[in-house]
């Protein structure tokens, strides 16, 4: 018997889902199944075939399948959920939440049916609330249902700091806590350039400007694109989580995790520092927060709770 190959299913074959599928295959992390609704089955198959045909050129060995049939996802190690609608002009946030919650619940039923032992990573917005909806629908332990936003938010923060200091992004570390929105909390005290505290390298007004730009990072790209939202960086962030799990790397990554008293919050999904490894969420890391940071995080939690009130 040959060794079982890793299998990752990506639900939603839009820009983010397709890019995640391609990056996962390109890194030879797993065979990939890209899933979308029956009306989009042919375009989904087309994208998967196009990626597969890149493999001889890029030199990677991974099977990539496009489908509208969840049976093809059976036995997945990880399922990444990017499916959902984007907010349209004139659409209320509550409408968006209600619609995407329905999608999350129907997708999760299929995921649980065919991959009862998988780890689920959620990207669909509003991501904190959608991760909670998937957790409730799945019946999985909290370790196996996590959301992605903090890696992306932190990547934006690191990018802007690197640009400001004219340094390699590899040398910039940082952490963004809280919900994925305008109330996220970039922790400047825990941010470094080559091990040197950021606060010793940049004046407060420049740091404040970077923090503000990070909070508005998604909107900045939406405005520039004019149609659609970011997908390269979100897909790269998802792929980093997939790799950490499949290789059991025990990476310290900001992740949307279910809190049971950590940071003083109960029964809510929120972006916090975590250890991510072979079991999914291995551990939540509790940092000491200043009064200001804690009050900012409280505000972020209120924003998440307001969205969660709309959930059925």
From Swiss-Prot:
SUPFAM superfamilies: LDH C-terminal domain-like, NAD(P)-binding Rossmann-fold domains. CDD domains: LDH-like_MDH. Keywords: NAD, Oxidoreductase, Phosphoprotein, Tricarboxylic acid cycle. Substrate binds at residues 87, 93, 125, 156. GO terms for molecular function: L-lactate dehydrogenase activity; L-malate dehydrogenase (NAD+) activity. Belongs to the LDH/MDH superfamily. MDH type 3 family. InterPro entries: L-lactate/malate_DH, Lactate/malate_DH_C, Lactate/malate_DH_N, Lactate_DH/Glyco_Ohase_4_C, Malate_DH_type3, NAD(P)-bd_dom_sf. The modification Phosphoserine is found at residue 149. It comes from the Bacteria. The keyword Transcription regulation does not apply. Its EC number is 1.1.1.37. One of its GO terms (biological process) is tricarboxylic acid cycle. The gene is mdh. The keyword NAD applies. NCBIfam families: MalateDH_bact (TIGR01763), PRK06223.1 (NF004863). The active site is at 180 (proton acceptor). It catalyses: (S)-malate + NAD(+) = oxaloacetate + NADH + H(+). This is Malate dehydrogenase. PANTHER family: L-2-HYDROXYCARBOXYLATE DEHYDROGENASE (NAD(P)(+)), L-LACTATE DEHYDROGENASE. NAD(+) binds at residues 12-17, 36, 100, 123-125. It holds the Pfam family Ldh_1_N. Catalyzes the reversible oxidation of malate to oxaloacetate.
């Amino acid at each position: 018997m040959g060794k079982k190959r890793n299998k990752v299913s990506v639900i939603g074959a839009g820009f983010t889902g397709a890019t995640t599928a391609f990056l996962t295959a390109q890194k030879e992390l797993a065979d990939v199944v890209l899933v979308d609704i029956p009306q989009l089955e042919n375009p989904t198959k087309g994208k998967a075939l196009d990626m597969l045909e890149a493999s001889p050129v890029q030199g990677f060995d991974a099977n990539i399948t496009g489908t509208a049939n969840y049976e093809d996802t059976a036995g997945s190690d990880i399922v990444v959920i990017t499916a959902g609608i984007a907010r349209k002009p004139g659409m209320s946030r509550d409408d968006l939440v209600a619609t995407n919650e329905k999608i999350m619940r129907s997708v999760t039923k299929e995921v649980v049916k065919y991959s009862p032992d998988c780890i689920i990573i959620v990207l669909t917005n509003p991501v904190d609330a959608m991760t909670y909806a998937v957790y409730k629908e799945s019946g999985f332990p909290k370790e196996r249902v996590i959301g992605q936003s903090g890696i992306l938010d932190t990547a934006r923060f690191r990018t802007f700091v690197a640009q400001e200091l004219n340094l390699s992004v590899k040398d910039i570390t940082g952490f963004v806590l809280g919900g994925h929105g305008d109330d996220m909390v970039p922790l400047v005290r825990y941010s470094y350039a080559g091990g040197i505290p950021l606060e010793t390298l940049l004046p407060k007004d420049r740091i404040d400007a970077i923090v503000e730009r990070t909070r508005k990072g998604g909107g900045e790209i939406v405005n520039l694109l004019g149609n659609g939202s970011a997908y390269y960086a979100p897909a790269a962030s998802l792929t980093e989580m997939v790799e950490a799990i499949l290789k059991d790397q025990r990476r310290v990554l900001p992740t949307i995790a279910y809190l049971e008293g950590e940071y003083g919050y109960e029964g809510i999904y929120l972006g916090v520092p975590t250890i991510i490894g072979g079991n999914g969420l291995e551990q939540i890391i509790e940092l000491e927060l200043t009064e200001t940071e804690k009050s900012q995080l409280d505000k972020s939690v209120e924003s998440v709770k307001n969205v969660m009130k709309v959930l059925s």
